[in-house]
UniProtKB/Swiss-Prot annotation:
Signal peptide: none annotated. It catalyses: carbamoyl phosphate + L-aspartate = N-carbamoyl-L-aspartate + phosphate + H(+). L-aspartate binds at residues 80, 162, 221. It comes from Sulfolobus acidocaldarius (strain ATCC 33909 / DSM 639 / JCM 8929 / NBRC 15157 / NCIMB 11770). PROSITE patterns: CARBAMOYLTRANSFERASE. It comes from the Archaea. InterPro entries: Asp/Orn_carbamoyltranf_P-bd, Asp/Orn_carbamoylTrfase, Asp/Orn_carbamoylTrfase_sf, Asp_carbamoyltransf, Asp_carbamoyltransf_Asp/Orn-bd. GO terms for biological process: 'de novo' pyrimidine nucleobase biosynthetic process; 'de novo' UMP biosynthetic process; amino acid metabolic process. Its EC number is 2.1.3.2. Pathway: Pyrimidine metabolism; UMP biosynthesis via de novo pathway; (S)-dihydroorotate from bicarbonate: step 2/3. Carbamoyl phosphate binds at residues 51-52, 101, 129, 132, 260-261. This is Aspartate carbamoyltransferase catalytic subunit. The lineage of its organism: Archaea, Thermoproteota, Thermoprotei, Sulfolobales, Sulfolobaceae. GO terms for molecular function: amino acid binding; aspartate carbamoyltransferase activity. Catalyzes the condensation of carbamoyl phosphate and aspartate to form carbamoyl aspartate and inorganic phosphate, the committed step in the de novo pyrimidine nucleotide biosynthesis pathway.
Length: 299
């Protein structure tokens, strides 16, 4: 593996290797091999971040590497007008890899085409967030010991959420029984994404119609800024909150995931249920990203 730009960059075999590595790293985050010893990784975040930035930083340090970088472009030469290509060339001079987040779709792919060192996409616009998808499916596999045969429901903003695109794509490496796409018409998953998929999907608007069939409920935030009519947003927003009532209608062993941060799309009462796995999901950020870095640099 060199660049990680899309969820499609992972084969099933590679994902299963990452699952096994993550199991190991979860027990001991201090890897004795220190596969990044003597290496410097640049974390170049042109958008602010908390979890992704810090978990990559911690993963690199745990593997013996050094970290340089920034979160937010305000303090960089980008604020003075430097173009992305020049920034990437500069980072090639300073480091052995680039973990990059950018507001524009395709920015990570562009960077990989001019970079001599590995580029890892940590989120590019509304395009993809592939390492988050690996965290998602690792969490699912940890709970069910399989991905195959499960019924999924993705709920909320399915049009602009890059985590959704990566999850839909990474599921092509497995055999889900069915994926429900639950959203208002305005925020349905993009047709070009759905046309790529090799498993059955069904679009619905009311989560209560299908929630009793679901093994994995994946929730995303509905973005207020996409709506022209604020009253329409308020109406739709209230229809896509995971209430305790909705959670209680799910299967006994089902789980609820969220890539975080959340706003109000999951009722805080749901946090206390056994189905709420989103904080556990977030805790796997460091060991999963250690495993991905190991696949790139340690083999």
């Amino acid at each position: 593996m060199k660049h990680i730009i899309s969820a499609y960059n992972f084969s099933r075999d590679e994902l299963e290797d990452i699952f096994a590595l993550t199991d190991k790293y979860s027990k001991n985050l201090n890897d004795t091999r220190k596969i990044l010893s003597g290496k410097t990784i640049s974390i170049a975040f042109f958008e602010p971040s908390t979890r992704t930035y810090l978990s990559f930083q911690k993963a690199i340090i745990n593997l013996g590497g050094d970290v340089i970088g920034f979160s937010g472009e305000e303090s960089t030469s980008v604020a003075k007008g430097e173009n992305l290509a020049d920034t990437i060339r500069m980072l090639n001079n300073y480091s052995d890899g680039i973990v990059m987040r950018h507001k524009y779709d395709g920015a990570s792919r562009f960077a990989s085409e001019i970079s001599d060192i590995p580029v890892i996409n940590a989120g590019d616009g509304k395009h993809e967030h592939p390492t988050q998808a690996v965290i998602d499916i690792y969490t699912i596999n940890k709970h069910f010991n399989t991905i195959d045969g499960l019924v999924f429901a993705l709920l909320g903003d399915l049009k602009y959420a890059r985590t959704v695109n990566s999850l839909l794509r990474i599921l092509t490496r497995f055999r889900p029984k069915l994926v429900y796409l639950i959203s208002p018409q305005l925020l349905r998953a993009r047709k070009e994404i759905l046309d790529e998929l090799n498993y059955p999907v069904k679009e619905v608007e009311n989560p209560f119609e299908v929630i009793n069939e679901v093994d994995v409920l994946y929730v995303t935030r509905i973005q207020k800024e996409r709506f022209v009519d604020e009253m329409e947003y308020e109406k739709i927003k209230g229809s896509y909150i995971v209430s305790l009532d909705l959670a209680n209608k799910m299967k006994k062993d089902s789980i609820i995931l969220h890539p975080l941060p959340r706003v109000n799309e999951i009722d805080r009462k749901v946090d206390k249920t056994t189905k709420a796995k989103y904080f556990e999901q977030a805790s796997y950020g460091v060991p999963v990203r250690m495993s991905i870095l190991t696949k790139i640099y340690g083999e």
